[in-house]
Amino acid sequence: MTAIDLNADLGEGCDTDEALLALVSSANIACGWHAGDVNTMRQTVGWALRQGVSIGAHPSFPDRENFGRTEMHLQPDEIYAGVLFQIGGLSAIVRAQGGKLAHVKAHGALYNQASRDRPLAMAIVHAIRDFDPSLVVFGLAGGELVKAARELGLQAKEEVFADRGYNADGSLVKRGTPGALIDSEDAALDQTLTMVREQRVKAIDGTWVPIRAETVCLHGDGAHALAFARRIRERLGSEGIAVRAGA
């Protein structure tokens, strides 16, 4: 049976987090630098553990004002220290509740810059490796972060997005520009199934781009996030595609 991991970015102040955790297999929990705090981290970790969901850290630039979506140009040692700090904080909370951190997925601008900026990607991966080399690195399919992780001997998962538009080079269409977000649930469902089954995605210019789909992101902060998550779980099930973190 074909299987896929479904992940969601959680602990960011949305009231659907607990319900979403019943539908996804991996949770990326905000570590306080773009959203959340120690209380939301503890609460979300507890929910995830009760649901048996794989827990990951969701570190970002220090940018609460802009939800971590503004590009920043920090030195590699600053990136290293910031990622290490955020991973360590969440890992301590997970351990205190009897669990273990499983993966790391950068957030927002940090994620996007790391997909194309090799020195930044290497700084992130060095921090992850030095903290715990068993952690899995989630990164944009085909991007520099995934390449850096594998180069340093870490396991990586190539991530695709159900509700985001793609450029012809495999990058995500920048937020705020036409085609960045897929508002139609049907279109997002079709895109997800195509990526999982056919390992390709149609870019906004109409070209088909090869893509490796190992984990699918369902954004937890969308207006219809919960309804869409239910639909995609149902659709995947009807297509004979299992959902599990180890996929």
Swiss-Prot record:
Entry EC number(s): 3.5.2.9
A molecular function (GO) term: ATP binding
Signal sequence, start to end: none
Nucleotide-binding recorded as keyword: yes
Its job: Catalyzes the cleavage of 5-oxoproline to form L-glutamate coupled to the hydrolysis of ATP to ADP and inorganic phosphate.
One of the GO biological process terms: carbohydrate metabolic process
Subunit structure: Forms a complex composed of PxpA, PxpB and PxpC.
Chain ranges passing through the membrane: none
UniProt keyword terms in alphabetical order: ATP-binding, Hydrolase, Nucleotide-binding
Top-level taxon in the UniProt lineage: Bacteria
Protein name in the entry: 5-oxoprolinase subunit A
Catalytic activity: 5-oxo-L-proline + ATP + 2 H2O = L-glutamate + ADP + phosphate + H(+)
InterPro entries attached to this UniProt entry: Glyco_hydro/deAcase_b/a-brl (IPR011330), LamB/YcsF/PxpA-like (IPR005501)
Family: Belongs to the LamB/PxpA family.
The keyword Cell membrane belongs to this UniProt entry's keyword annotation: no
Organism for this UniProt entry: Ralstonia pickettii (strain 12J)
